[in-house]
């Protein structure tokens, strides 16, 4: 295998032949050059011969002289083969009486052949024994990018990878063993000499070992990654009749074997590729990319007629604004090198549709100078287009490569932020006189420039599907009368009388027109002239509008309306309030029949408590006698005007919005606020009380404990105790009640519990948050004995050790403590009104 320095592959770089014009014969006898007359006659015959070739006119126009002769010979050879193979009658060949019938049959065969080629996943290839392409179907262009006229009667080795040429030569031999002397010259392609066999030396045509199935890599112009496409060849060796070749001695040679195969891509195409592979179309452009022609497939895909396509002006009007600079770069490359390379961009089709295409443009020369451009486009799917767009964004620095440009979303060539302000001339006499700077318009750009093509495009083609609007468009392009009213409010605050009058003409669209324009000559129609005149009569100029724009841009309507700003909204408040309301609603529905007894019992309990307070007022000073009553009133009826209080539930800060509590009568004395945990050390959080029935959701961090309520009352005292790590109660519980109790010590003892202590009103404590349940006392209260504090009790020792060692904050409690050992002697127990639920007897994680 050669090093590949002199290896050449097939390409499509050929010059267009010179188009000769018929010159009139001079009237006088002017001498002419005989050689020139000979060349003119030869060119005339070649043009006539080229017109007889069965190829489209656009293919014929770019053929050179040698290609015309090559294709003419190939056509004659193919016709001779089919004459023998199809065994057509002389009458049909010479145009006998059945000429009309033959034309109908040929037309039907042609249509059937075209349909078969379109349905075939590949192309037909016939290669002779001397490695010349005898025939290639027109569908070769869909897979390799070569025209049918580019490969016919050319060496097949120019298409095959150098590493696969030996294998292809072996497959051409009938015994898979070509002569070793016939080596493939990798630099020039075909072998130096061909060996011809007689029919006696060749096997029958229908032999099984004449079948072929192999793979090799072919040169592909559509693949930019490697330049080759792996193809699978499947066919058989057959005799090529009708060639009438002669040997060196002049004797007629017998028909030789040739490879008839179908070449298919090794990787099967997807459904979308099968759908789009037959829609490759070509367009013809001037050197400035102005369209001057389009084939039938292009008209079918884009939806334009050739007249509509060629009368619009620059071809950049059909290109997406985000792809213009990318296509312009390929355009410049084509002018410099003659070929643009594969370029992926979006073309605007009819009915407001964008089509991704992969294009390759070539420069066609005439008389040694560039004449026009031929562009070959292949439609792509949207997924393929977006993939190419992502690859392009990594290599190109400007933002237009990513498709995110907003230049095409506004009417002005510049965005409102980038739009240059008119230069005003300040004067003491009038503020209406101003001299604007020259604003860009459609006429200020060159007709063939990119900006001119961009301005000529309709804005609506970029709004379907709607894209994200520019920041200023949401306020000014799509503004409403309500927003104009908000502008008026801002002007009133500034005290501008002229701005107050702006509401009459303050529509957002008019404001946008005023922003993008200048004096009256910039408004071509009468409507905009009237707008400009009204603005001048009201004393409003563009500087005022600019200041109004800036003020409106940084001011939101919600703030002006007095609404709460988003940053002031506590999401946790809303969540906890919703949970609380849901629990309250469900509880009220389940226990509606119990609401009336609850209120009555609470009222009775309060009245009894107040009677005790009146008795104790005779023995204690008024300030001290009034304090426990305030505590009880506060525990029964919490504050109703509390806002959202921040509390910590299970170690997490949250917000809690209390709902209105159940009301009851307390005519004896005015209820006052009681602040539990009023002196916290290291924290400033407040704990609202929850008097609603079953207002606190069920939690695992809850230990039920039931204690009776005793009437005795003593002075309050402050006690330092830890906020965590309480041990569970050692005393037995009597029911599944959702209450807990808290022990108090009298004021005259610093490290012990008073023998006069009783139990305070039951309260539920949750890991930093506290709620109050409404309680029902029994029909009567039975006094019980009081239990003295004993140091031998293990529960008391453990409790006091924690109190002494881990004091976190001070808290004021009532000194009413009940006997722990006589809890079962009470006649009525406090209980929760909601449905009883079994709770696990575990150590709580919070306060007890």
UniProtKB/Swiss-Prot annotation:
User: Which parts of the sequence form the motif Nuclear localization signal 2?
Assistant: 36-41
Consequence when changing residue 260 to D: Reduces transcription activity. Impairs interaction with ARNT
What's the protein called, per UniProt?
Answer: Aryl hydrocarbon receptor
Per the annotation, the residue ranges of the short sequence motif Nuclear export signal are 63-71
Print the miscellaneous field. Although it interacts with NEDD8, it does not seem to be neddylated.
Q: How does it assemble?
A: Homodimer. Heterodimer; efficient DNA binding requires dimerization with another bHLH protein. Interacts with ARNT; the heterodimer ARNT:AHR binds to core DNA sequence 5'-TGCGTG-3' within the dioxin response element (DRE) of target gene promoters and activates their transcription. Binds MYBBP1A. Interacts with coactivators including SRC-1, RIP140 and NOCA7, and with the corepressor SMRT. Interacts with NEDD8 and IVNS1ABP. Interacts with BMAL1. Interacts with HSP90AB1. Interacts with TIPARP; leading to mono-ADP-ribosylation of AHR and subsequent inhibition of AHR.
- Show where the record puts the motif Nuclear localization signal 1: 12-15
Q: Where is this region: Required for maintaining the overall integrity of the AHR:ARNT heterodimer and its transcriptional activity?
A: 49-81, 116-124, 260-262
Q: What is the effect of changing residue 112 to A?
A: Reduces transcription activity. Decreases interaction with ARNT
Q: What effect does gene inactivation have here?
A: AHR knockdown in the retina results in reduced electroretinogram responses, thinning of the outer segment, and degeneration of photoreceptors.
Name the PANTHER family for this protein.
ARYL HYDROCARBON RECEPTOR (PTHR10649:SF9)
On induction, the UniProt comment says: Induced or repressed by TGF-beta and dioxin in a cell-type specific fashion. Repressed by cAMP, retinoic acid, and TPA.
Q: Which UniProt keywords apply?
A: Activator, ADP-ribosylation, Biological rhythms, Cell cycle, Cytoplasm, DNA-binding, Nucleus, Receptor, Repeat, Repressor, Transcription, Transcription regulation
Q: Gene encoding this chain?
A: Ahr
Domain PAC, by residue range, is: 342-380
bHLH domain location, by residue? 26-79
Q: Gene Ontology cellular component?
A: aryl hydrocarbon receptor complex; cytoplasm; cytosol; cytosolic aryl hydrocarbon receptor complex; nuclear aryl hydrocarbon receptor complex; nucleus; transcription regulator complex
> In which tissues has expression of this protein been reported?
Expressed in all tissues tested including brain, heart, kidney, liver, lung, muscle, ovary, skin, spleen and thymus.
